[in-house]
Amino acid sequence: MSLADSVLAVNNDLPIRTDSPVHSGKVRSVYWLTDADSRRLIKTKGYNVPEDTPLAIMVISDRISAFDCIFHGEGGLKGIPGKGAALNAISNHWFKLFAENGLADSHILDIPHPFVWIVQKARPIKVEAICRQYITGSMWRAYSKGERVFCGITLPEGLEKDQKLPDLLITPSTKGILTGIPGVPAQDDVNISRSDIEANYQAFGFEKLEDIDLYEKLLKDGFKVISKALADIDQVFVDTKFEFGYVTDKDGNSKLIYMDEVGTPDSSRIWDGAAYRDGKILENSKEGFRQFLLNHFPDPDVLLNKDRMPEREALARDNDLPLEAMMQVSRTYTGVAEKVTGAAIPLPANPKADIIKILREEYDLIL
């Protein structure tokens, strides 16, 4: 098997029994199970959800996206070796820690394989729940241009790039394109304020006004749990994005849960603690890959300017990135995962075959 064979790049063509179209995201694909299979698994596997809960198989890939494009490497390498397994392992670890600390549940019911989650269907909150402990990235870019109000929060004068903020800040943005909300442009990833959410809480998917307080508490509490654990291995939790949704429990009550992934190098910035104390930034997240791309291509504006999206897509499609750059990302992701979990990340030679075998033999879900 070659290195390219060990990468799961295409994850939306598995022969999983479903009666709905496969939903393909940038990194994960979701296969909604039939009602009969959902009910069977809930009963035979003992999942603690109502018997009529829709279930899905969520399969992560090793694809690498940045600036809203998928990139690939030399030698037919269509993704990052170990990336998918690393992301899932990190999220699994944090979700377990959240449960131990009495925080909310996640959408994950079962983990058949390092690349696979069995999840319950949730009603998503249409907010990218972003939490920041340091001023960097888009917040710093806005601040350096003189902006002092960010997502409705007034920032103090005199802040310097990459410094720790006086408070842990929640700076939400829209999840997807939302229409008909006063003062909120119908664009993806638009910064919004808490007052925007309060005035239109149902349009953002909140069932009750007071659930805004709950989502903020779960966001901050989750951030603090991860930040403390990362500090114990001398890593700095800089900022992150969480996602939330509602599920119905066995008693028929709605409850807010964590969704998607949490605290990963894809959804967060993580800095090396020793380097930060020396006044340097050593990225242990996808931000390092983004910086590589900005330096690698002669015209970085293509990657930053939303008006040049066709050029950006062509750039990603037509350029094989150096193998060493791809492997550096692999080392970053697997390294963080091994530090966080304390265990080596499995790198199966043929992950797709492994997934099909397990889902056939242990779950009877393969056509």
Swiss-Prot record:
Q: According to its UniProt record, which protein family does this protein belong to? A: Belongs to the SAICAR synthetase family.
Q: In which pathway does it act?
A: Purine metabolism; IMP biosynthesis via de novo pathway; 5-amino-1-(5-phospho-D-ribosyl)imidazole-4-carboxamide from 5-amino-1-(5-phospho-D-ribosyl)imidazole-4-carboxylate: step 1/2
Q: Which gene encodes it?
A: purC
Can you name this protein? Phosphoribosylaminoimidazole-succinocarboxamide synthase
Keyword Ligase found: yes
Q: Which keywords fit this entry according to its UniProt record?
A: ATP-binding, Ligase, Nucleotide-binding, Purine biosynthesis
High-level lineage:
Bacteria, Pseudomonadati, Pseudomonadota, Gammaproteobacteria, Alteromonadales
Top-level lineage group = Bacteria
Q: Name one GO molecular function term.
A: phosphoribosylaminoimidazolesuccinocarboxamide synthase activity
Q: Which HAMAP family match?
A: SAICAR_synth (MF_00137)
Q: Which reaction does it catalyse?
A: 5-amino-1-(5-phospho-D-ribosyl)imidazole-4-carboxylate + L-aspartate + ATP = (2S)-2-[5-amino-1-(5-phospho-beta-D-ribosyl)imidazole-4-carboxamido]succinate + ADP + phosphate + 2 H(+)
Which PROSITE patterns did the record assign? Answer: SAICAR_SYNTHETASE_1 (PS01057)
What EC designation does it have? 6.3.2.6
A GO CC annotation recorded here is:
cytoplasm
Biological process annotations from GO: 'de novo' IMP biosynthetic process
Top-level enzyme category: ligase
